[in-house]
Amino acid sequence: MSEELMNRKGRVLTGIVVSDKNDKTIVVRVETLVQHPLLKKYVRRRNKFTAHDPQNECGIGDKVKIIEYRPLSRNKRWHLVSILEKAV
């Protein structure tokens, strides 16, 4: 399934799992660095994305890779590709 997902077009993001309470769903926090338009200083921006986790294999604190996918529910538009690091 992950090879099929990686061949799709769409954004690929890396983030940390902050919630895994829902069945087959994880919430991933993604941090990006953006330059402030006026101050020219780099600011850390955080977004939360709801992603599909079909085997319920992720835990809180895991570093994961997610990819854009078709809408699966009202808020779920991302799919888990792989777990890069397991939390201790």
UniProtKB/Swiss-Prot annotation:
Name of one Pfam family that matches: Ribosomal_S17
GO biological process: translation
Keyword field contains Ribonucleoprotein: yes
Keywords: Ribonucleoprotein, Ribosomal protein, RNA-binding, rRNA-binding
GO cellular component, one term: cytosolic small ribosomal subunit
InterPro entries in UniProt: NA-bd_OB-fold (IPR012340), Ribosomal_uS17 (IPR000266), Ribosomal_uS17_bact/chlr (IPR019984), Ribosomal_uS17_CS (IPR019979)
Subunit structure: Part of the 30S ribosomal subunit.
Function: One of the primary rRNA binding proteins, it binds specifically to the 5'-end of 16S ribosomal RNA.
Family: Belongs to the universal ribosomal protein uS17 family.
Name by which UniProt lists this protein: Small ribosomal subunit protein uS17
